Structures are given as C-alpha cells and as structure tokens.
C-alpha cells in the first residue's frame, strides 16, 4: 500500500479495508463517496455499482466509453486488488451453513472478473500471492504496466476465480450432491 501511495495511486476501498488503509496513514476514498450509495443488506452489496464497474470495464481506447464515463462522472479504475472472503477456511473451521454462505464473495469475484476481462487497461491482483510481483513491477516501472504484465495478472485472476468457484461447487456437491445422488439411486430401484 505504501508503494502504491508513493507512486501517486489514489486508493478506493470499502469498510474494514478502508479503515485499515487509513490506520497506516494513507488516504483512502470510500466507495460510498464515489457511488453516493451506502453499503446495503448487511454489507452484501457494496461495490456492485455502475460507478465502480464502469470505471473498471471502460475501454480507454474507445471514444464512446470515455464519453460515457465523463458524462456519468465515473472515475477510471486502473488497478483492482481483491482479497476474497475466506470461504474454504470457513468451511474447514466447521462453521454452520449460514456462516459459510455469508463467505461466498459476490462483489469480490465480480471485481476480479471485470478487471481481468479488461486487462488491456486494468491490472487485477486477485490474491496475496500476487502482492510481491505487483510491488516488484511498481518498483521497476513506476505506476505503469505493460500489456504482457496485465495479461499475466488476468490469467492469475481467472485461476483464483476458478478455484474459488470450484470450492463453492465442491461444498454444495458434498453437502447436497450426496443426498441427491442417493435419492436418484433410490428412484432407480
């Protein structure tokens, strides 16, 4: 974070992460200040907003996109860093199903997919394992990236997304799949 701040990167975040960033003495804009919409449904909806996703998905080289983000006052978002809710750790902890379900990240996974889709213009860092490569890149080039670097981060992001969704599938398959298969087998006999 300090490296990003030193490079002149303006940070935008939600809730607890924003508080953490500010506790380090680094300024951070609240997502709610950009969207002019509060976090709702007990925090289930924070970043799912056109002013966030428009800023990520905007194609910088397409005049029509640039005109629309100007018209709707959407800030360009060039770097997305996501730390997904710990779904697998919550399952492994033996938590009950309501707690497990709350750890299915919707906004985070959507941010990852949007940023990875627009890797031509956006860097996506989808896991803590990618923090050091990002820091190394920033130290070497400043706050600029190559298409090859952005594409690598996008590939890694889709790997994180795929793994996360597979873990959720495996949870539901293990919990309900076995009961469904047993029911189907009972109907065959």
Task: Label the predicted regions.
Residues 1-30, 113-114, 120:
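N-terminal phosphate-binding or glycine-rich loops at protein starts, especially the Walker A/P-loop
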Residues 6-9, 24-27, 49-53, 74-82, ...:
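Short coil/turn connectors at secondary-structure junctions
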Residues 10, 14, 49, 62, ...:
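Generic structural signal for well-ordered, non-membrane alpha-helical segments
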Residues 16-87:
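Glycine-rich nucleotide/cofactor/substrate-binding loop typically near the N-terminus or early
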Residues 22-26, 33, 40-43, 68, ...:
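Short acidic, glycine/serine/threonine-rich loops at helix termini
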Residues 79-102, 106-148:
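A short, charged helix-loop
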Residues 129, 133-189:
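Active-site loops and adjacent core secondary-structure elements that bind or stabilize anionic groups
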């Amino acid at each position: 974070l300090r490296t990003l701040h030193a490079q002149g990167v303006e940070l935008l975040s939600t809730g607890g992460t924003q508080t953490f960033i500010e506790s380090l003495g680094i300024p951070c804009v609240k997502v709610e200040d950009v969207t002019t919409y509060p976090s709702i449904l007990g925090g289930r909806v924070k970043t799912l907003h056109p002013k966030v996703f428009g800023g990520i998905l905007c194609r910088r080289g397409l005049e029509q996109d640039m005109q629309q983000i100007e018209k709707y006052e959407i800030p360009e978002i060039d770097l997305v860093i996501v730390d997904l809710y710990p779904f697998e750790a919550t399952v492994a902890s033996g938590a009950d199903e309501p707690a497990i379900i709350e750890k299915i990240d919707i906004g985070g996974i959507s941010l990852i997919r949007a940023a990875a889709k627009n890797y031509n213009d956006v860097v996506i860092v989808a896991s803590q394992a990618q923090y050091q490569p990002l820091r190394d890149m920033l130290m070497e080039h400043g706050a600029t990236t190559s298409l090859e670097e952005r594409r690598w981060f996008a590939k890694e992001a889709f790997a994180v997304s795929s793994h996360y969704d597979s873990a959720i599938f495996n949870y539901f398959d293990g919990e309900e799949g076995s009961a469904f298969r047993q029911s189907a087998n009972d109907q065959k006999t």
